[in-house]
């Protein structure tokens, strides 16, 4: 019975975009880890986005007509988004801020698009017919984890793209890997921020939404083409806008 599958890809991505924007606004106006209900609620809503993005990167791998162009497009927007990500988090302090690890050694040195792009590469490795050895594939995937580590959500997002692709069509297995990887990720926060470590598991809120996916991008080809580029462009543009508003003190800050 599939009557409940009422959402196409465009609709789910739009939900993810709204959730992401709410989350990023929360980081901007409620800096740090405040234990207040409003920023916590906003961050819980925002946890919907990452698994949804991983899911659709994996779906894109199976639907794209040219995986090489798809991969290049992902890395191009990873580069563009890196600058927007730094501006959003730190404002504009000079060109040095765009160099990873120049100012600090925090885990998130670039945007989640970097980790998603490497997740796509993981899928390509896993499904490659040119790489015959399972050991070689495992080694390459481990190396990709290291390369993707500096991105937002670390290598967790990359591994989730791989898991969503590997277990495509089996939502319960995808959910298990989601809980496992994010649980490990949240555990790293546990010693100094238990509330926000636990909050990461709100990613499971994405599962009921993904259950409604009908397997289609949308019904209007022209609108689909527009939305494809809208999703790519919105991410860096909204980050840059938040960063500019922060830099010029045009956003209220609640501490």
What is each of the regions a protein language model found here?
Residues 1-255:
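Alpha-helical transmembrane segments and their immediate juxtamembrane cytosolic regions
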